[in-house]
Regions:
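A short SAM/SAH-binding and catalytic strip from SAM-dependent methyltransferases
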Residues: 210-223
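Conserved Class I S-adenosyl-L-methionine-dependent methyltransferase catalytic core
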Residues: 70-142
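Short, glycine-/aromatic-enriched active-site segment of Class I SAM-dependent methyltransferases
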Residues: 245-262
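A short glycine-rich, Lys/Arg-flanked "PGG" loop and its adjoining helix->strand segment in the class I
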Residues: 224-236
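N-terminal accessory segments
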Residues: 1-95
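Conserved beta-strand signature within the Rossmann-like core of class I S-adenosyl-L-methionine
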Residues: 237-245
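Conserved SAM-binding loop of SAM-dependent methyltransferases across substrates and taxa
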Residues: 157-169
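Conserved SAM-binding loop
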Residues: 186-187
């Protein structure tokens, strides 16, 4: 994970500086590992391991990738409690993990935490300073410009649309989400965009220049079908901006996202393999930190892709 610091510095310099610098950022990321190890031990000791639960699966795969637990789930490596970072956004990142920790990892693993509480935490994360600057830095790394017709899958409360419209002037912006209540909230949060309550891109029409898959793939129950339908809506030469937390990145953050209604848990390579079945990889920005980030394009030719 830390081997990617040079690439992160290149594309996410604002994010690093806002966190207080490289050393402060590393302290913050160390907390994500520490909390993940803590939550796993609590779940393991309570006999609450069920790998069918995305939250539990995310912890298991992340910690296995770091050789911190055995195949049977038994912890094999202790993690020293990190030093608290001093940077504002780095501290905010740690506090997010603390908020989730207060819910109780075992209760989350057993589905004993009210879903509304988890949804509220997710909404809070979208408005945190570290998350806002991270997403804005990612869009700049994609060299996004004005004038695009934009599609956002699983738009939830509209916070990504709000961020996008702060910096860009799209020709149009359409978000879709299966939850009508969230669509109503999104219309208030980002009045400059349009939102519709549908469960899939397969129910939509139109043509788009850009699709924002920023922390989205974990929600999709049937990703190949959804990507097929997204592909039909994307103009030839249109681009997908993909930012996907994965088991090779920040384990605590991935676990938090996975606890909030996730359908899938991916490695970065699984994300790439999935997307290249339907689209062409134009540029990989980063593999793991703070997420897998890449730009994909719909080929202009009509040839059938394998």
């Amino acid at each position: 994970m830390y081997l990617e610091f040079p690439a992160v510095w290149r594309y996410f310099r604002d994010y690093i500086e806002a966190s207080g610098g490289i050393l402060e950022l590393k302290k913050a990321l160390d907390w994500s590992v520490w909390y993940a190890a803590k939550w796993w031990r609590e779940i393991y000791d309570a006999g609450a391991v069920n790998l069918k639960k995305p939250f539990v699966k995310a912890l298991y795969l992340s910690l296995r990738a770091k050789n911190m637990i055995g195949e049977d789930g038994r912890p094999v490596k202790e993690v020293k409690k990190p030093e608290l970072p001093k940077g504002l956004y780095a501290r905010e990142w740690v506090e997010m993990h603390q908020q989730f920790d207060e819910l109780g990892a075992v209760k989350v693993a057993r589905d004993e935490v009210d879903r509304n509480v988890l949804d509220l935490l997710f909404s809070d994360i979208q408005t945190m300073g570290w998350h806002r600057i991270m997403v804005k830095a990612f869009l700049r790394a994609c060299e996004e410009t004005d004038g695009h017709a934009v599609l956002e899958p699983y738009s939830r409360e509209g916070h990504l649309a709000q961020l996008y419209i702060e910096d860009y002037k799209p020709e149009s912006y359409l978000g879709y989400d299966p939850n009508p209540s969230l669509v109503e909230v999104a219309r208030q949060v980002a009045p400059g965009a349009v939102f519709t309550p549908v469960s899939s891109a397969c129910q939509l029409s139109g043509q788009f220049d850009v699709v924002l898959l920023v922390e989205k793939l974990q929600w999709v129950a049937d990703p190949l079908r959804e990507l097929d339908c997204i592909g039909r809506l994307l103009k030839p030469g249109g681009r997908l901006y993909v930012a996907q937390p994965n088991v090779d990145s920040m384990p605590g953050y991935l676990a938090i996202l996975s606890a909030i209604g996730a359908q899938q848990v991916y490695t970065w390579k699984e994300v790439e393999n999935l997307l290249t079945l339907r689209f062409k990889l134009e540029k990989r920005l980063i593999k793991t930190m703070p997420f897998y980030g890449a730009i994909y394009v719909k080929p202009r030719s009509a040839e059938v892709r394998r």
